[in-house]
Structure formats: structure tokens, C-alpha cells
């Protein structure tokens, strides 16, 4: 389990950074700085690794495990098998989405990347330098989707193009310069000379890698405009319904069918509404009390 954790968490340095504040405490001292690998070779390696994980799990005697261990076993087995089952539908994945796609989320992650040590700063700068290559892989992936008739709609594509163009406006005063400088100023243990050096390096990485990455992505997507064959959403692709069911299982951990889950939600909603109606019928003043109630952030977090 520890080996699986280390392998998976170090596949993407951003995930590692936001998951573990001090990797050394977990024995993770030597890891490659990477944004991940989207190549077909990497995908094949990932599938082989999943098969090895499942093989490793099968070596355990399930009945001899504790209840907690059985729960861990079940979760891992389901997670690994689910990914393998849908591996052939990888082109249904969408890396570029208006609010949650890579192009939208990566700048936020860079902005919020905390600097707790000199190594954090150096890892961050290395990630910036890798961004254009990573975006090139995204472009290749989107072209492959287009060739397969699975490219996004023109509306979604134009939205992302506009985002990319907006991101590089006023690059001399970009927020990734300002936020970097603020974090560097707060980091103790660096000399003024080191801080000045890192500031210059950050601006250089933005000019040479980040801004060109977004320019190239916008240009590539512009070339792909008109490649989309479906304006109606995921379920309208040939195997879109099946992929949606996979996403539901992957994101919720539920093994029930879509129809069963819909019924469960509907029944629970009816139950809650009925309970609310009964309470307010017996105590009409609850309506007024509810409208007057206010919650502090602490209250809402614990409610």
C-alpha cells in the first residue's frame, strides 16, 4: 500500500505538493518534478501498473484481513478495476473545460502553490518550465479526439480560446508575477540576492514557457474549430452514456445504476420535504425563525 501511495502521489508534483506538506516524513525524498505524462506510452504503462496492483491485491487472503483492511481492499480493487474497464474510452475524457479544465485550473494552482522551503520554489520554477511541453501533449490529445469525432462543441472551444487569450493580456503585470513576489517575500531563510534571482527566474519562465503555452493552445484550438460533431453534451456521443455512468461511479464510489441513484435521491427529497412540512404545520413559527437565522462560517462548517 505504501508503495502504491508513493508511486501515485509522485506522478504529478502539484498533487504531491498539495497532498503532503512534508514528503520526507513519508519517506519521499527523491521524486521527479513533473506535471504528468499524457502520452500513449504513459497510458499503456499506467494500465500495466493497474493490472499489477490488482495482481498484488489478489495475493492477500481476503478472509484473513481485518474489517478495516477489507474496506481498503474493496476500495482499491474497485478503483483500479474501474479505471481498467474504461481505459479504451480515454478519448471521452476532456482535459479542457471552461471552469474546471487544465487551462483554467493550472494558473490557480500555480497562484496558490505555497513556498515553505527553497525546494518548493525550485520545484515551482521547474513546473513552469514544463508547462509548454505539457500543453503540447494536451494539443495532441485534442487532435486525436477530433480525429475520432469526439472533439468539443464550437461554443465550448471558443470559450476556452477566449480564456487563453485573456490569460496572457497585460503579461508584464501578470498576477503570477505579483503573487510569486509576495510568496517569495514571506519565505524566510533566503538571502535578498536569492529572492531577486528567483523573481527574475519566475518572469523568465512565464515569458518563455507559460505565455507561449497559452498562445499555442489558443492557436491549436482555433485550427480545430468546426471539428466537433456534437453540440448536445456527453451523452450524445456514441458511447457517451456508458462513459457518463463510469464518471458517476468514479466520482461517487457508488456501484448502483443511474436509475437506482435517481430513485434514491428522489425518495430522500420527498422524505425531507414531508418532514419539513410536518414540522412547520405543527410549529408555524419555524418559518419566521428560519428566515431570521444566520450562521457564522464556523456554524455552517459544523452543521
Q: Can you annotate each of these PLM segments?
A:
Residues 1-303:
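N-terminal maturation segment of proteins
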Amino acid at each position: 500500500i505504501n508503495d502504491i501511495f508513493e508511486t501515485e502521489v509522485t506522478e504529478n508534483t502539484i498533487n504531491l505538493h498539495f497532498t503532503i506538506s512534508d514528503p520526507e516524513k513519508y519517506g519521499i525524498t527523491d521524486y521527479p518534478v513533473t506535471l504528468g505524462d499524457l502520452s500513449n506510452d504513459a497510458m499503456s504503462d499506467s494500465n500495466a501498473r493497474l493490472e499489477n496492483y490488482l495482481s498484488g491485491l489478489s495475493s492477500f487472503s481476503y478472509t484473513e484481513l481485518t474489517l478495516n483492511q477489507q474496506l481498503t481492499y474493496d476500495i482499491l480493487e474497485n478503483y483500479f478495476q474501474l479505471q481498467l474497464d474504461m481505459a479504451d474510452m480515454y478519448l471521452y475524457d476532456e482535459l479542457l473545460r471552461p471552469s474546471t479544465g487544465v487551462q483554467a485550473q493550472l494558473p490557480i494552482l500555480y497562484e496558490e502553490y505555497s513556498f515553505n522551503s527553497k525546494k518548493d520554489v525550485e520545484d515551482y520554477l521547474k513546473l513552469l518550465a514544463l508547462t509548454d511541453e505539457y500543453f503540447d501533449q494536451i494539443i495532441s490529445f485534442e487532435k486525436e479526439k477530433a480525429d475520432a469525432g469526439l472533439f468539443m462543441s464550437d461554443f465550448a472551444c471558443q470559450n476556452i480560446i477566449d480564456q487563453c487569450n485573456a490569460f496572457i493580456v497585460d503579461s508584464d503585470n501578470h498576477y503570477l508575477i505579483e503573487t510569486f513576489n509576495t510568496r517569495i517575500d514571506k519565505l524566510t531563510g533566503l538571502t535578498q540576492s536569492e529572492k531577486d534571482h528567483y523573481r527574475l527566474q519566475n518572469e523568465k519562465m512565464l515569458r518563455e514557457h507559460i505565455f507561449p503555452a497559452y498562445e499555442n493552445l489558443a492557436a491549436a484550438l482555433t485550427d480545430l474549430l468546426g471539428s466537433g460533431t456534437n453540440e448536445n453534451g456527453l451523452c450524445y456521443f456514441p458511447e457517451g452514456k456508458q462513459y457518463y455512468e463510469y464518471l458517476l461511479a468514479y466520482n461517487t464510489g457508488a456501484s448502483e445504476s443511474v436509475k437506482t441513484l435517481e430513485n434514491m435521491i428522489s425518495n430522500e427529497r420527498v422524505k425531507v420535504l414531508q418532514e419539513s412540512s410536518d414540522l412547520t404545520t405543527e410549529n408555524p413559527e419555524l418559518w419566521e425563525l428560519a428566515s431570521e437565522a444566520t450562521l457564522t462560517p464556523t456554524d455552517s462548517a459544523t452543521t
